[in-house]
Structures are given as structure tokens and as C-alpha cells.
Amino acid sequence: MADQRMDISSTISDFMSPGPTDLLSSSLGTSGVDCNRKRKGSATDYQESMDTDKDDPHGRLEYAEHQGRIKNAREAHSQIEKRRRDKMNSFIDELASLVPTCNAMSRKLDKLTVLRMAVQHMKTLRGATNPYTEANYKPTFLSDDELKHLILRAADGFLFVVGCDRGKILFVSESVFKILNYSQNDLIGQSLFDYLHPKDIAKVKEQLSSSDTAPRERLIDAKTGLPVKTDITPGPSRLCSGARRSFFCRMKCNRPSVKVEDKDFASTCSKKKADRKSFCTIHSTGYLKSWPPTKMGLDEDNEPDNEGCNLSCLVAIGRLHSHVVPQPVNGEIRVKSMEYVSRHAIDGKFVFVDQRATAILAYLPQELLGTSCYEYFHQDDIGHLAECHRQVLQTREKITTNCYKFKIKDGSFITLRSRWFSFMNPWTKEVEYIVSTNTVVLANVLEGGDPTFPQLTASPHSMDSMLPSGEGGPKRTHPTVPGIPGGTRAGAGKIGRMIAEEIMEIHRIRGSSPSSCGSSPLNITSTPPPDASSPGGKKILNGGTPDIPSTGLLPGQAQETPGYPYSDSSSILGENPHIGIDMIDNDQGSSSPSNDEAAMAVIMSLLEADAGLGGPVDFSDLPWPL
């Protein structure tokens, strides 16, 4: 029985144990499955392999390392961002500590507000490349009063402080009495504009404008948009280049008045002349400065919107300006001649004057504007200058005048030499204005007979040939008009207007466009004169608009003497000394009101005939031939 059981167990064990052939087949089958799995390489197999690796201890370790690397990369990026934010916040805090407006705030400001305040503070400091405080001006061993007296003594003027908002005189030194003859108490608290010349008020208001000084540092909350009240301690005031001021103005002088009788014409003119001279030219130089209202001791309760605003004032020194008279140069030293530029209308009136004219002529630019240059020419030089005036209106070339005398403010004459050229509008082809560069001619140059400065001698073609002289004879004495210095004549300003009307009339009579007159827009010598049968030709032959020759010399002037064309018949009034503006207006038939009405009636008749509302048109009333 026992043997039987042993045989059965050995048979079962033999059956259960694989043979060599079975082992080979099983190993091949397993390797084939693995090869097929590697050969497919699909995402599903990779995921299954990863899932299989998770079950395997070695696979789980690799998966954990992979997840750890991803987590470490994320933590490193967040750390970098955190360090960047911390660094930016530290810079913002440091910037806020450097800006005074941010440092004075009680609460912490957001980044945008800090950056905006920093930009505003840098704009405030712009232009002050070398800022310095008031303390750097004064040495330590000098007091304020001593320094003030030294400055006034060196400047030979007076110190004044004027508010920029209303022009109120806040302070003036006692030395103002030496210049304006006003005491210190008379001016303090008064308006500066009450003591200025009416033509200079606008200029001084422009100089008192504080738009280009340091801007007001008014803070605005970024969240609410409302102004923020700050407790900023005012630091020492700074001066920047944009706050500098230097200008000329005329101020009243408290001179003792002279009692005159109004009935006397000469006394009345003398009074007007004295009134003109009651103003003196003051050269003011200084700075615009700002002070807090509390420091100035001003009451600001009436202005609720005045918080954070500073009071802007002009602190300047006024000095009496005296015009420069050219002195003869001794020796061979050559210096640059003094000159100024002026611009004139076609009739000779000043429309622009360079500021350098004040130092030469003693006139302020606003005194010359609107006046005719002929009012300042010497009567012996008007004939030559009138001829140059015609030439500059007829040609595009530069015209250089001879030496002539120009009346300055004190009544004396200064010798000038000018270069004129006309500016033509490129669209309308008309002369708009004349530019004149005026150079001072020194006395030693005239005495030495410099050939580059020809001088015009007295000739019959002077003031007498340009203005009516009456019927008493060809020559008469010049009347002396009270208030007008000798050497000039009353009514000389109309000469420029007459010359301009003459050139315009000739151009209108010719009826040609400016571009068809050759090289000159108003050339009257390049084309033949009109027919004498026409109204324009009769007018020219009668002496109303004489022909101007292209060549000629001044009477009594040699051939080699440099000069400009001039002829007896070229004068406006050479043949008819009694002609005037009213005579020219009466002779211009085409521009009278009656002719204008006739022309308008003909035009209306043409319109009615064209529309079928009237009969035939009668052209007999036309003021010009058809």
C-alpha cells in the first residue's frame, strides 16, 4: 500500500515538472511578448509600463525622483520672483525716502504714487544744474544790511520786490529817491503798473509771469483723485536759470512840475514835451523767487484753495539806463561797429525794432513802432533816402544808403548807414516789408574820408523838394515847431506813404502781374510807358506819377563818387510842388466813390441781363475805356 502511494506521488511530480523542451518554448514565448511590446512603443504601453513600474519598488523610486525634480523647479521659480519683488520694493522704499514729498507723508504710499512724485521732483530740479542756496551768496563776515548797501552801491540803483500776482510793490530800497525822486514810503504797497508807461505794462506783465519757474508740488492721491495735504517743511529757496529776468521799462519820475499857461501854444507844447520826459528808462535785472505765504506774513484765509501754493515775487535791481553815444576811436584798434535791425512797412513805418536800438538811439522799441522813419531823418538826407526807398520797392537787390543823420531821443543826430532789402511774399508776389540793417558810422571815419562810407552833401533834392514849399518862392526858412528839435520837418512822415502809393499806382496802371515785370515785381523802367491817350498816360504826362530813369547821378556829385540814381524828374513833387495826398486821391478817378457806384451799376445790369430780368447793358458809364 505504501509502495503504491509512492508511485502515484512520483508520477504527479514528473508530470508537474517541465522538461527541457517546455522550458525553451516558454522562454521564447516570453521574449517574444517583450519584443512585441517594445516594437509598438505606443503611449498606452508606456503608461502601462509606468503603472507596472509603480508596482515595482525600483519604478516607484524613479517616479518619486521625477516628481521631486518638478516640484523643485517650481519652488526655484517662485523664489526668483520673490527675490525680484523684494528688490523692487526695496528700491521703491529707497526712492520714497529720497523724495521730500514722499518722505513727508504719514502713511505708506503705493508704488505708482511714489514714482509720480519722483518724476515731479526731478522736473522741479531740472534746469538747476548748479543749484545754490541763499546762504552761499553772502559771506559770513557780512550782515544782511551791509551786503544790501554794498550791492546797491556797486549797482548804482535801487532794490525792489514786486509780487507776480498783482504787481504790488512789497519792498523798495531808500536809494530809489536818487533815481525816481520817490520816497520809500510812497512806493511800498502801491501797484507797480501805476508807475509804468502805458506801453510798457504788457511787457512787464509778461516778465512777471512765473510759468517757467519751479512747478507747484501739489500732491494728488492716486485712489481718490483729491489733493493730499502734506506737512512739508520749506527748505532753502533755489534759483534756476528759467527764473532769471532782465528787461527795460519806463517809470515815472517825480519831478517838480512847472506852472504854464494853457493859452500859450508854445507853453502847451513845452508841457507835452516835459510830460514825455517825466519817464526815465530803467534796466531791471533779477530773479523770480517763491516764498511760503506764512514766511511772508500774509493772510491767506480769504483764499481757501491756496494751500501748498507759494508766493512768487520778482527780486530785482533797477538801474537808470543811459544811451550809448559812439566815441571816436583813437589809434588803429578796429572794433565791431554797433548796429541794429529794423523792419518797416512799404510806407516806411516801423513794424519791428531790435533791442540793440535802445543803446544806440535811446528809444525803446515800443516808442518807434508805428512811426515813420522819415520823421527821424535829417532834412538834407531825405531826398537820397526817398530815392533808395523807391529802388528797394522796385528791385530785389540790396540797397546800401549813403551816410545820413538820424535823430536820437535827446534831439541830437547820429550818423548811420543802412542796408535795405525788400521781402516779397512768394504767393502774392507783393512786397510785404523792408528789412534795414543800420550801422553806426564813427566820427573819425567821416573825417578821414573813408571811401567805403560815402556821405551825401546838401543838395537841392532835400526836404524842400519833397514837401510843398508854398508860392512865396523856391526857398523858404524852416519854421521852428515847439517840441520838435531842429533839423527835421513837420509832416515828413507822409513821404513814405506817398512813395508807396506812387509805386502801387504805377503798378496798377500798368495792369500787369508782378511776375511779368522782369526781375522786379514793381519795375517801372523795363516796360514802355502807357499811351498818352489813356487816362493813366495823361496822368503820368501831367506829373502825377512821373517816370523814374534807370540811370542818373546826384546833382553836384562826381562820376566816381558812389551814389544811387537820382534825377530832377524822379521826385514825387519835383514838377508840381503843391501836390499832396488829397490831390492824388482826387486824381484817381477809378477809385472815387462815384466811379465805384457806376461800376457796381454796370455789374448789376450784366447780372440782370444774364438772368433775363433787364434790357441791354449801357457801357457808357464805365470809368475806364473798353
From Swiss-Prot:
Modified residues (N6-acetyllysine): K538
Stretches assigned to the PAS domain: 143-215, 326-396
Chain positions of site Important for interaction with CLOCK: L125
InterPro entries named among the record's database cross-references: bHLH_dom, Circadian_TF, HLH_DNA-bd_sf, Nuc_translocat, PAC, PAS, PAS-like_dom_sf, PAS_fold
Position(s), cross-link Glycyl lysine isopeptide (Lys-Gly) (interchain with G-Cter in SUMO2): K259
Keyword Zinc-finger: no
Short sequence motif named Nuclear export signal 1, residue ranges: 142-152
Organism field: Mesocricetus auratus (Golden hamster)
An MF annotation (GO) of this entry: sequence-specific DNA binding
Cross-link Glycyl lysine isopeptide (Lys-Gly) (interchain with G-Cter in SUMO2 and SUMO3): where in chain: K252
Metal-binding among keywords: no
Chain positions of cross-link Glycyl lysine isopeptide (Lys-Gly) (interchain with G-Cter in SUMO): K259
PROSITE patterns: BHLH, PAS
Its biological purpose: Transcriptional activator which forms a core component of the circadian clock. The circadian clock, an internal time-keeping system, regulates various physiological processes through the generation of approximately 24 hour circadian rhythms in gene expression, which are translated into rhythms in metabolism and behavior. It is derived from the Latin roots 'circa' (about) and 'diem' (day) and acts as an important regulator of a wide array of physiological functions including metabolism, sleep, body temperature, blood pressure, endocrine, immune, cardiovascular, and renal function.
UniProt modified residues of type Phosphothreonine: T21
One GO location term (cellular component): chromatoid body
Phosphoserine PTM sites in chain numbering: S17, S78, S90
The protein, known as: Basic helix-loop-helix ARNT-like protein 1
One of the GO biological process terms: positive regulation of skeletal muscle cell differentiation
Residues carrying the site annotation Interaction with E-box DNA: H77, I80, E81, R85
Quaternary context: Component of the circadian clock oscillator which includes the CRY1/2 proteins, CLOCK or NPAS2, BMAL1 or BMAL2, CSNK1D and/or CSNK1E, TIMELESS and the PER1/2/3 proteins. Forms a heterodimer with CLOCK. The CLOCK-BMAL1 heterodimer is required for E-box-dependent transactivation, for CLOCK nuclear translocation and degradation, and, for phosphorylation of both CLOCK and BMAL1. Part of a nuclear complex which also includes RACK1 and PRKCA; RACK1 and PRKCA are recruited to the complex in a circadian manner. Interacts with NPAS2. Interacts with EZH2. Interacts with SUMO3. Interacts with SIRT1.
Domain PAC: 401-444
Residue stretches making up the bHLH domain: 72-125
Post-translational modification as stated in the protein's UniProt record: Ubiquitinated, leading to its proteasomal degradation. Deubiquitinated by USP9X. O-glycosylated; contains O-GlcNAc. O-glycosylation by OGT prevents protein degradation by inhibiting ubiquitination. It also stabilizes the CLOCK-BMAL1 heterodimer thereby increasing CLOCK-BMAL1-mediated transcription of genes in the negative loop of the circadian clock such as PER1/2/3 and CRY1/2.
Domain of life: Eukaryota
